[in-house]
Regions:
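Clamp-loader machinery-focused feature within the broader ASCE/P-loop NTPase space
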Residues: 2-163, 167
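Structural recognition of the conserved hydrophobic beta-strand(s) that form the central parallel beta-sheet
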Residues: 155-159, 172, 183-189
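Conserved catalytic/switch belt of AAA+ P-loop NTPases
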Residues: 145, 170-181
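Conserved strand-to-helix beginnings and helix N-cap segments that scaffold or border functional pockets
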Residues: 166-170, 291
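Conserved adenine-binding aromatic site and its adjacent loop/helix in ATP-hydrolyzing domains
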Residues: 142, 174, 201
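Charged, glycine-rich active-site and insertion segments that engage polyanionic ligands
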Residues: 1-51, 55-58, 65-69, 181-184, ...
Length: 373
C-alpha cells in the first residue's frame, strides 16, 4: 500500500515519512485509532516506504522490486500476525497457516480499509472468537531470528494485539524491548486499554484520527458515482469510518429512519411486547445492518443535541428526520442523550464480539426506556 492511496491524514503521513528520512524510526510503534481509523493502511504504507528502493519525497515509488512485492503483501521481510478463529479442523498446522496467510493477503487487496469482523467473515470464522494464540508469539520470535532477506529492514506487523492470548502477549515482551538490529514492530490497535501496560510502555504511540467528513466526501466523490444527496447522507452516517461508508454504498437504501422512530416510540411507551418483537427483528438483520442501525441512532442523538442547543446551522437533518428530532428533543435532555449514546456504544461493542443480537438489543431497549421516559 502507498500513502497516496490513503485519503487525508496529511500530518501523520508527513511525520512517518520524516522519521525515515531522518533515520529516527522507533523500533516499536503502536498505531492507535478508533475502529474505522486507517491505522492498518498507514502501517502498511509506512512499511512499503521503508522497503522502497527508490523513495520519493512523499511516497514510495511503487515500481521497484521491493514495492511490487509490498503492494502484493508478499515482501519476504514483512511478517504479519493477526487474529484467527479456531477453524483448522484436521488440517496440518503448516498448511493451515499457509492458507490463512494467503487469505490475509487477498483480504488486504480486496478490503484495504476492512475491520476485524470483515476479516473473520472473509476467511469463514465469523461464528468463533478470533485470537492471537501463544503459537503466534512463538512465530514472531522464530521469524525475527532470521536476518533480512532483501531489505535493510525487517518489519513485524501485529494487527489487533488486544486479541493476544495473555501467554502470547507475555511471550513477546523481551523481543519487543530488545529486538534484533534493523527490526521494527508495528502494532495496530483500536483498544490500547486492553493491552498489557508492559507492552504499551515499550512502544511509541502514533495517534491516527478518524477521517473528517470532507475527507470521506472527497474520497467517495472520486471513487464512486453517487448522487450528491445520497453521498452526503452516507458521509454523515459514516462518521469518519471510510470502510463503513463504502459498505453503505453497497447496501440497499436503508429504512433506518422509520425503524428507529418506531423503536424510540416503543421505548418511550415502555411497550415491552413491541420491544421483544423488535429485538427479534433486529436479530434477523445481518451484522452490517445491525451496526448501521446503532450508528444511525447515535447520529440522531447527536442531531437532537444540536437542535436542543439551537445550533441549527450545523444540524444536518431534513424532512422526516428533522420532524423526529424536533419532537424527540422535547423529552431528551443533554444528560439523557449522553446516557443513550453510551448505551448504544456498549451495545455496538458487544455486537462486534459476537454477542447474541437479540439479547443485546432487548437489553438496550429496556435501558433506553428507562432513560427516555
Amino acid at each position: 500500500m502507498k500513502f497516496s492511496t490513503i485519503p487525508g491524514l496529511t500530518e501523520v503521513k508527513a511525520m512517518l515519512i520524516d522519521s525515515v528520512k531522518s533515520n529516527h524510526i522507533a523500533h516499536a510503534q503502536l498505531f492507535l485509532g478508533k475502529e474505522g481509523a486507517l491505522n492498518l493502511p498507514l502501517a502498511l504504507a509506512y512499511t512499503t516506504y521503508l522497503h522502497c528502493q527508490n523513495k520519493g519525497e512523499t511516497d514510495s515509488c511503487g515500481t521497484c522490486a521491493a514495492c511490487v512485492k509490498s503492494l502484493k503483501f508478499i515482501h519476504p521481510d514483512t511478517n504479519f500476525v493477526f487474529p484467527l478463529s479456531n477453524i483448522k479442523g484436521d488440517k496440518d498446522e503448516e498448511r493451515f497457516k499457509a492458507e490463512m496467510l494467503k487469505s490475509w493477503r487477498q483480504f488486504l487487496i480486496e478490503q484495504p480499509f476492512g475491520h476485524l469482523d470483515d476479516w473473520t467473515n472473509f476467511y469463514g470464522g465469523e461464528d468463533k472468537q478470533a485470537i492471537i494464540s501463544r503459537e503466534g508469539s512463538r512465530e514472531i520470535i522464530r521469524s525475527l531470528s532470521l536476518k533480512p532477506f532483501e531489505s535493510k529492514f525487517k518489519v513485524m506487523l501485529i494487527w489487533q494485539p488486544e486479541y493476544m492470548h495473555p501467554s502470547a502477549a507475555n511471550g513477546i515482551l523481551k523481543i519487543l524491548e530488545e529486538p534484533p538490529p534493523n527490526t521494527f514492530f508495528f502494532l495496530i490497535t483500536n483498544l490500547a486499554e486492553r493491552l498489557l501496560p508492559t507492552i504499551l510502555s515499550r512502544t511509541q504511540i502514533i495517534q491516527v484520527p478518524l477521517l473528517s467528513d470532507p475527507e470521506v466526501n472527497e474520497y467517495l466523490a472520486k471513487k464512486q458515482d453517487l448522487e450528491e444527496t445520497r453521498r452526503q447522507k452516507i458521509v454523515q452516517q459514516a462518521e469518519g469510518d471510510l470502510n463503513f461508508a463504502i459498505k453503505l454504498i453497497d447496501s440497499e437504501e436503508d429504512h433506518n429512519q422509520e425503524i428507529f422512530t418506531d423503536w424510540m416510540r416503543s421505548c418511550f411507551k415502555k411497550d415491552y411486547a413491541s420491544l421483544v418483537g423488535l429485538a427479534d427483528n433486529f436479530h434477523e438483520l445481518d451484522k452490517m445492518s445491525q451496526r448501521n442501525l446503532l450508528y444511525y441512532g447515535q447520529t440522531m442523538m447527536r442531531e437532537t443535541l444540536l437542535h436542543r442547543a439551537g445550533a441549527t446551522e450545523i444540524n444536518r437533518a431534513t424532512g422526516n428526520e428533522l420532524k423526529f428530532i424536533q419532537d424527540f428533543s422535547k423529552v431528551m435532555t443533554t444528560s439523557k442523550i449522553d446516557k443513550a449514546n453510551q448505551l448504544m456504544n456498549e451495545a455496538g461493542y458487544h455486537l462486534e464480539r459476537n454477542g447474541s443480537a437479540k439479547m443485546i438489543f432487548l437489553d438496550l431497549s429496556i435501558q433506553l426506556s428507562a432513560v427516555i421516559k
